[in-house]
Amino acid sequence: MPPSVTVFSSHPLLGVTIERRGEDQDDVHMHPAGQGVWVARMAAELGSHPILCGFIGGETGTVLRPLLDTLDAELRLVRTDASAGTYVVDRRSGEREMVATAWSEPPSRHEIDDLFSVTVAAALESEVLVVCGGVPQDALPLEIYGNLVADARAGGTKTIVDLSPPGLNKALEGGADFIKLSNWQLGQFLEADATEPENIRNGARRVLEAGAGCVMVTRGGDPALIMTADKTWELIPPKFTAGAAEGSGDSMVGALAAALAQGKGIEDAVRWGGAAGATNFLRHGLGTGSRDVVSDLLPRVELREVEG
């Protein structure tokens, strides 16, 4: 059995995409979607065994469940009375235009307890737990994030957190091993500007002081900043002119999780993350990419140590 990565993704989504097939005809595609789904997909592609934990229910859940079954992942889903969330994207113009959304209703207290216990049990069987946000963001009580991280770490499982505040703040209380966030999420955490390099460095230190073992701050097309208590790096992936950035961060997290689960150190893991994010960009896909392409791009990812 490959090393396991548990992915906490409270609300997997049904994604519907409209694309132009020809001059007078369209294509409509349905696929499993959401941050956790995309993380799990890349983790599986890079040789890990993902365990996806989340809710499923309602009419859209009936459509979504067989699509989730196509993932190379173990599913540990909790039934809920609420329908799974759905979005519709129109790509006929060449751009990704969101035209409709219908998010899930908040789960009950008992359903939340069921998902929490299922996730902790899975995490204790795994090398890594990834904690992702749900849609809507306020669907769960915030303390669940810190409790998941604390219980997983107490059992010897590494933890990766990809959340916006205030969920991020609660996860930090649990002592997360690795925090991945964008510079705008860092700005939310700081309640201050996080666009200038010095502000980002100072903000990353604040995240470490709040309980993280390592923090990565992505900055769109600029190099990402990675910081631990004693080292700081810039991650510079290859740049390409044509592609789509949606899902690149989730591909990066999936690769990070797979690498850490397989025993790689932080430096190797973040380089794998950079290569996976670049691969996702080339494919216009959310959490997609082949292991061969990621491996081919890996030598082109630069990790440069800088002053903290």
Predicted regions located by residue number:
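Short beta-strands and strand-loop turn motifs
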Residues: 99-100, 126-134, 162, 180-183
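Conserved phosphate/ATP/ADP-binding segment of small-molecule kinases
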Residues: 143-232
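Short beta-strand scaffold segments in enzyme catalytic cores
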Residues: 41, 86-90, 223-226
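Short catalytic helix/loop segments, enriched in acidic residues and glycine
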Residues: 19-39
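Conserved phosphate-binding/catalytic region of the ribokinase-like
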Residues: 169, 197-308
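Conserved N-terminal subdomain of the carbohydrate kinase-like
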Residues: 22, 26, 45-128, 296-308
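Alpha-helix C-terminal capping segments
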Residues: 40-49, 258-263
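Positively charged, low-complexity intrinsically disordered leader regions
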Residues: 1-22
